[in-house]
Design a protein with these regions (language model features):
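Conserved functional hotspots at enzyme active or ligand-binding sites that engage polyanionic ligands
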Residues: 1-104
């Protein structure tokens, strides 16, 4: 497991206006902290608008979005299967989006 990996994670229903089932996600936890029991992830979706807090990407021949505004921490036992890794240009755009999202 490492930062920018794309994983299929165990579905976990949530309440309110958050994504109900994570499905695909990107790990955003820094590699220096990857040994912790929980990781910070950004859910991925193909059903979104291209808004400032979403990073557009292509994965598995589909256009999708990494939802920086839906970050969450999940236990490692919920990670089912590694499916790939973000391309380097998407990694840079995701880092820029995270910096802007958390700017004070």
């Amino acid at each position: 497991m490492k930062r920018f990996d794309i994983w299929l994670v165990m579905k976990n229903p949530e309440k309110g206006r958050v994504v109900d089932n994570l499905g695909l996600c990107t790990i955003v936890t820094p590699d220096e902290l990857i040994e912790l029991p929980n990781l910070i992830v950004a859910p991925m979706t193909t059903e979104s608008e291209n808004i400032e807090s979403r990073v557009q990407c292509r994965f598995d021949n589909a256009i999708g979005y990494i939802m920086v505004d839906q970050l969450r921490t999940i236990d490692k036992f919920r990670f089912i299967k590694k499916l790939g890794e973000l391309e380097s240009d998407v990694q840079l755009r995701l880092c820029d989006c995270l910096l802007e999202f958390f700017a004070l």
